[in-house]
Amino acid sequence: MRDSRVSFIAAPMIGRLNHVGVATPSIDEAVKVYRDLLGATKIHDKFALPEQGVWVCFVDTPNSQIELIEPYGDQSPIHGFLAKNPKGGQHHVCFEVDNIVAARDDMRAKGCAILGSGEPRIGAHGTPVIFVHPKDMGGVLVELMERPDGAH
């Protein structure tokens, strides 16, 4: 018997949860939480994504990653988030898709707003990404990223 609470579609777009983005005023301080309190053992080096206005550091978990993001430069979009949430917090969730342009076009056809120019840009994993406006995603900022070669 089919569960009426579950929606079925012909070709699901959503893929694996790649990471949860966490905004922080200090990646160095946030790393201490994941390492010292939660026991994370694989913490990648911090690196800059100036074109997106963020510093990034990935923390590996057994089945996904936490993406720590800190403002980079005066125009960082993270400043606005931290103004409302001074200690930081969950910023976005990121799902993998097979084809970022097809995913973008599908989301637009369904009436969803894509942030920025709407054109995919290269994200922290080196693959194209887009962000879907939280107003269309139940209040959650959703990043869609083209599936990277090789899983982390």
Give the positions of each predicted feature.
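Extended macromolecule-engaging scaffold surfaces
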Residues: 18, 40-44, 141
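Vicinal oxygen chelate
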Residues: 8, 12, 24-31, 37, 47, 57-59, 73-76, 81-136, ...
